Amino acid sequence: MRYFAVLLALVMLFTLPLSAGCAESAAADAPVVVLRVADYGDIYLELYPDIAPVTVENFLSLVDSGFYNGLTFHRIISGFMAQGGCPLGNGTGNSGRNIKGEFSSNGVDNPLQHERGVLSMARSSDPDSASCQFFIMHADAPHLDGSYAAFGRVISGMGVVDALCQNAHVTDSNGTVPKEDQPVITEAARADRAEAEAAAAREAANGAEGGVFDDPASGLSFPMPEGWRLERCENGVAAFTDGAAAFSLTAMDVWRQLGQAARTEYAAAGHTRDTLNTAAFNRGAFAASAGVTEDQLTEQTVNGSLWLAAAPEKDGAVRYYRLGAVNGTVIILAGDEKAVPAMEAVLSALTVE
């Protein structure tokens, strides 16, 4: 009999290293800022006052004043960038102060290229109109070089940027995010470099084969099964792998295992490894396989993330759900006899007390 198991895990995506082609090097005393984004996680930014002193001074002044607290990411284009910091939430607001554009077409040498993870200032057609709105590159965009003031880089939390871009609900090709769906920056504050480096180290450790998965935000820590690792894929999706078996995960949550009865019913309905990803988006199929009603399942759906748990485990499941960073998409994974032991090792570590 073919066995099925569900691996429901916290997915971490990783910050890419600085490009070898970049002329700038991270100074030990470069200021660091953290953006805490509700339901997503923390983005640590290293700023470069040696490259764009006016821009960095302006950004830090706004951070120190609490200006960004409660503002949002209002424009998101996956494969391009995520823009935020507008007090009106529509791209037209400013801080009441405009600064000189520090880029080559405006007479200022700025060697920082608009690569993935780079932080830059938004502006209108006026080269000196930048004020408070910023954007973080989701992918390289060399056509922006020389025309916008790049002034920093993500050093930890690029996975948060990936999640923002992957989960954004936009209404047009310009990346407009409806007000009610805009990710909220709960806090923007200066951060210790040691704090940022520790976050980056956790990302690296969680991405290594073997080792310990450590996520202080959710209070979870468990040994990675032998032969398994969390890796970054070209499309920004992470995958657990154990040789031949690769399991796609876009969830940013901790998930619970289905009971054997639900797995049996799910298999009896004709679902196979190849069809599970498609079925993951069918709430009716989930409700039937889990033995819960459509209303119960809807109740467990938050910001586009499907939450599936057997009724007896609901309280514990919701606890773990809230500990995780939401706005992911759960992918139900089917394993064969070879994969089940490794999957169950992870699930065992996530058992609710």
Describe each region flagged by the PLM.
Residues 8, 12-16:
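Hydrophobic core
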Residues 22-209, 256, 304, 334, ...:
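Cyclophilin-like peptidyl-prolyl cis-trans isomerases
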Residues 1-7:
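Bacterial N-terminal signal peptides that target proteins for export
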Residues 41, 203-238:
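N-terminal "mature-domain start" segment
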Residues 193-202, 232-244:
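Short acidic, Gly/Pro-enriched loop/turn segments at secondary-structure junctions
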Residues 40-42, 129, 219-221, 246, ...:
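Short, mixed charged/polar active-site loops
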Residues 185-186, 192-193, 228, 328-353:
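Surface-exposed amphipathic alpha-helical segments
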Residues 107-110, 234-329, 334-338:
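Conserved polar/disulfide-associated segments of primarily extracytoplasmic proteins
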